[in-house]
Every structure is written in C-alpha cells, then in structure tokens.
Amino acid sequence: MYILGIESSCDDTCAAVVKDGRELVSNCVASSAAEQNLYGGVVPEIASRRHIEHISQVARAALDEAGTALDEIGGVAVTFAPGLIGAVLVGLNFAKGLALSAQKPLIPVHHLRGHIAALYLTHPELEPPFLCLVASGGHSHIVRVQDYTHFEVLGRTVDDAAGEAFDKVARTLGLGYPGGPAVSRAAQTGDPKAYPLPTPHVEGPYNVSFSGLKTAVLNLVNKAQMKGERVNVADMAASFQFRITDILAEKLLLAAQDTGAKQICIAGGVAANGLLRETLAAGAKKLGARLYLPELQLCGDNAAMVAAQGFYEYRAGNTADLNLNGLATLGIDYL
C-alpha cells in the first residue's frame, strides 16, 4: 500500500511516498531555513507563506519521483499536530483537498509519532516495543513505544527542548540557524571541558531541563563582554554540546536500565548529533541493548516519516473526515 505523506509543521514543506510503512519510495523537501536564518530563527508568518508557495509543487514532485499516480495512493497522511498552527493548517488543508478530490482516506499523524516512524524506514526489522528518545526543536521526550499507535511518555523536558536550547545557544554565540548543525561544526575544534557547565536537577528520574544550561552559556558570554573579553566560541560550543548530549544519553540509558529494554532508539532533529550517537552507542553496548539510529536525512522534519506512521494509523483504523482540525499542542500519547 502506498501512502502519500504531507508535512508542514515548521519551516520545511515536505511530501513523500512510502510503501507499506517501511519502504521509502520518494522524499521531497523545500526548506525556508536560509531565509529564516536572516531573522535568527523561524518566523511563523514567513514559514506559512513559503508553505503556500511550495506545497503543490513538492507534492507533485513526490508523486513524480515515485512514479505513482494519485489514484494509486492508498491514503493521504498529514501532520495535524503539534506545530506552528499557521504552518500546520497549510499542509492539513492541502491534504484535505487531495483526499477529497481523489476520494482517498485522510490519515491524521502526530508529528512526534512520525519522527519515531522514521526508524522503520532505516531499520525495517525494528518492531515495538522499544524505548525512544525524541529530541527536536520543540520537544524532548523519552517514550515507551508499546505498539505502532500506543505510546507512553516516561520523561520529558520541564522547560526548553533540546533543539530549542541548541538554537538559542547558537544565536548567543553568533553561529546562525539552525543551531544544532552550527553548534556541532563549531565544537569540532573546541575543548568540551573548557567551560564546566551545570547539569540541572529536576523531579522525575527521566525528566530533563535545559533552560538553566542555556542561561549559563548566556551568563558566561555576558560576563566576558562586560570585562571587554570574548569567550572562545569553539570551546563554548563543545562544552555545551558535551553537557546536553551527556544529559540526554544518561536519561535514556537510565530508562532502558530500569525498564529492561533491549531496543533503544533516538529520533528527531537532535538525533543527527554525532556526539549523541557515539555516547549512546557506547552506553547501549554496556547495557547489552541494541541501538537504532535513523538515517541523517530522516532526522529533521520530512514527510517520509509522516507517510510511514500514516500506514500504521490507517491499519489501526485511525482516519479522519474533513472536519479534522490542526492543533498547536497535543501529547504523543493522545487517544
């Protein structure tokens, strides 16, 4: 069964075709990141306007690349939550129009469920149950994936998401947007022990907090400026990256140890971070667990993940009518 996926929850306009939830057939993305970089981050109004301009061409490109006609598609899967509401609505309304005109099922997909489903495209052998750290610009969750459509949140951020912290620290250091890749590049020549940044303590064994870590970087930069000095950007980037990836890895590995999970995964934009991947690989080996990592091209926002999860939502009977509304916030464990 072929599923057409549509994703527009942030600044990337995406469409893809996936077969049977596991086989990536096409994957097309039009990004406005370069334009957003001029403003130091995502401007929702600009993101929505670019989605309107690009979405029909991107969807057509995905079908053409797949060599598939719209009438051969089994359903139209679309991100309906969470995300920038204006951006979400562009993709949702486009998907409604496609589903109506082609008389195909409309399949609502939660954005974070989609990130997890990207793992099925990289690892067709992976099946629930497993533990997954989902870390992106807007979310940081440790999730027990019980089956393809049932999720239990074990831990979450109590303030800033990991990707958000990367973006804000990158802006503080003058590294540009998106912050994750920018910080990682700067950190390559830095000393991760140069600045001893704090490890915030929060209630809940698997919860995380990054607001204090972000503020610690800002304070060090401001203090240096007040003295007429400058922090070493490479060292600060390396120190921040070391601390935040250490926190994320520690929490996921603790959850795996406590639950006895033998399959652990990461997903979302932060899953592309090389140091996080290395740290988790070493930790998983010590636990005797297998670590599953998504392909780098499937870490950030894309529609392939939406189409993959859409297949399982459809199989579970989770379709919607044209009254489906977009939501800015919604837990991954919604019923």
Report residues per predicted region.
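Conserved phosphate-binding catalytic cores of ATP/NTP-utilizing and phosphoryl-transfer enzymes
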Residues: 109-131
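Glycine-rich phosphate-binding/hydrolytic loop that grips phosphoryl groups
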Residues: 115, 294-334
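A contiguous, well-structured pocket-lining segment that forms one wall/lid of small-molecule binding clefts
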Residues: 185-264, 274-287, 314, 334-335
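Conserved phosphate-binding/catalytic loops in two-lobed NTP-binding clefts
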Residues: 108-109, 281-306
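Short beta-strand scaffold segments in enzyme catalytic cores
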Residues: 13-18, 132-134, 140-144
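N-terminal beta-alpha supersecondary unit
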Residues: 2-82, 111, 115, 236
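Glycine-rich phosphate-binding loop plus the immediately following alpha-helix
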Residues: 124, 146-191, 214-215, 219-223, ...
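Short Gly/Thr/Asp-enriched flexible loops that form oxyanion-binding sites at enzyme active sites
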Residues: 78-104, 274-283
